[in-house]
Regions:
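Non-heme di-metal
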Residues: 2-288
Length: 288
């Protein structure tokens, strides 16, 4: 496979059946990421959005399964679906814990919201839905690369199981970052739609994140009692390593002829595959 001028070997995403220790006996502080109310609500919101979002990604790819003729791409799609399914399963287990702690994230995974998502998917074309998935996969790949490559982020204190979940999820997002994109191209998806969809998503990103985060914090009585702390932590989050320069990295997708594998994350993948799943990997004990 060739991405731009870079030759990339065919990689098959591996479905790892991981189960993290999110049992009822595991105790967390209220603000489980660095005792930071804003960052904790942000991570909780992301975790709440992942399971239904990834199910939508799977649906968008599956609808084209009978039009995928390349056996390598078929195998990559199977790995993509397996990985996304496992992500949803483990995030739901974490979400149950977070909801019990008072985080209001259950609405996004409710039956009512599922019906609305399915109605929306029926209103748009399958190709537009797939273009949305390809664009969203670039989002997650950009965030994943930051999480795994920046020492500033890895140094943030937090619960070990939560960090293991995030690192595992990030690793696998990089492993399958180009699958939906390649399906989109293989079934005739064009550049105009691809770029327009991403431009719209970029425009909506910060307003949507800011709004949902504000609503989440507004429902937190403890956070409401400390508004100056919330403002300080919000400035640190949006001015910090996760968001700094984010729009520029997302905008690479808008270049005509762009391919996700133009961004070389091979060395980062090898490093984290070894750190998490090597002989003494941090997650070996969680693999079933």
């Amino acid at each position: 496979m060739t991405a731009g001028s870079r030759s990339v070997p065919v990689r098959y995403p591996k479905t790892r059946r991981v189960r993290f220790p999110f049992g009822t006996d595991r105790q967390y502080g209220k603000y489980f990421v660095n005792d930071d109310s804003v960052f904790s609500h942000f991570v909780a919101g992301l975790s709440g959005a992942f399971p239904p979002g990834e199910e939508a990604f799977i649906r968008s790819v599956r609808v084209f399964s009978d039009r995928i003729t390349d056996p390598d791409l078929k195998k990559r799609v199977a790995g993509f679906i397996g990985q996304e399914s496992m992500h949803g399963q483990e995030h739901r287990r974490l979400n149950d814990k977070l909801i019990a702690m008072g985080y209001r994230i259950g609405w996004g995974d409710s039956k009512a919201m599922e019906r609305r998502r399915l109605r929306f998917e029926q209103l748009i074309s399958p190709l537009a839905h797939l273009a949305m998935t390809a664009a969203a996969e670039h989002y997650t790949a950009v965030l994943a690369e930051r999480v795994l490559s920046l020492d500033e982020i890895q140094a943030i204190p937090g619960d070990d199981a939560v960090w293991h979940l995030l690192n595992w999820h990030a690793l696998e997002e990089l492993e399958h970052k180009s699958v939906a994109f390649d399906v989109y191209r293989s079934v005739g998806g064009g550049e105009t739609t691809r770029i327009a969809v991403m431009a719209a998503l970029i425009a909506l990103t910060l307003p949507l994140v800011a709004t949902t985060l504000t609503l989440s914090l507004a429902g937190d009585r403890q956070a409401r009692r400390h508004p100056l702390r919330v403002v300080r932590e919000a400035r640190a989050l949006f001015g910090g390593p996760l968001f700094r320069g984010l729009m520029g990295d997302l905008a690479k997708y808008l270049r005509p002829g762009f391919h996700p594998d133009d961004i070389d994350t091979d060395a980062l993948l090898r490093r984290w595959q070894q750190e998490l799943f090597g002989a003494e990997g941090a997650l070996v004990e969680y693999v079933r």
